[in-house]
Amino acid sequence: MPSFDTVLETDLVKVKNAVENTAKEIGTRFDFKGTAASAELKEKDKEIILIGDGDFQIEQIHDILRNKLTKAGVDVRFLDIGKVEKIGGDKVKQITKVRDGIETEEAKKIQQLIKGNKMKVQAAIQEGKVRVTGAKRDDLQAAMALIRAEIKDLPLSFDNFRD
């Protein structure tokens, strides 16, 4: 029975390089000299921590990061941007999570989308992915097209296509 997996995975190496390039640019830019501006990646937690002297500076760092990620070929929709919080004195911090794997709510949304369109395929939620199975390859390709058209806020990809 033909099947494919709908996944949400990012290339952490490219994200790490983009964060390192962001930190390098922060160090060389004149408007960040003598400030607490920094960017670092915690690979275990898949978090990017931005530190700055104020909300405006955090936004500037975020713009640099988005630019570097785009140049590296990483979709910025992988970023789950957190709130800006004060960490003492005039400094502020923002934690941005790097999405990896489809969350349960999003997987249920994909599953309901497929069931709601009464397609001849079944969607099963597995750890961090949604497996779609069907009798015909054409049905699976129609399901892929439907998912791409309806779900715009996630950079989903399809892999493990079996015939």
From Swiss-Prot:
Domain of life: Bacteria
Swiss-Prot/TrEMBL keywords: Nucleotide-binding
GO MF entry, a single one: nucleotide binding
Annotated Gene Ontology cellular component terms: cytosol
CDD domains: YajQ_like
Database matches in InterPro entries: DUF520 (IPR007551), UPF0234_N (IPR035570), YajQ-like_sf (IPR036183)
UniProt function note: Nucleotide-binding protein.
Family statement: Belongs to the YajQ family.
Name of this protein: Nucleotide-binding protein Pnap_1080
Organism: Polaromonas naphthalenivorans (strain CJ2)
Source lineage: Bacteria, Pseudomonadati, Pseudomonadota, Betaproteobacteria, Burkholderiales
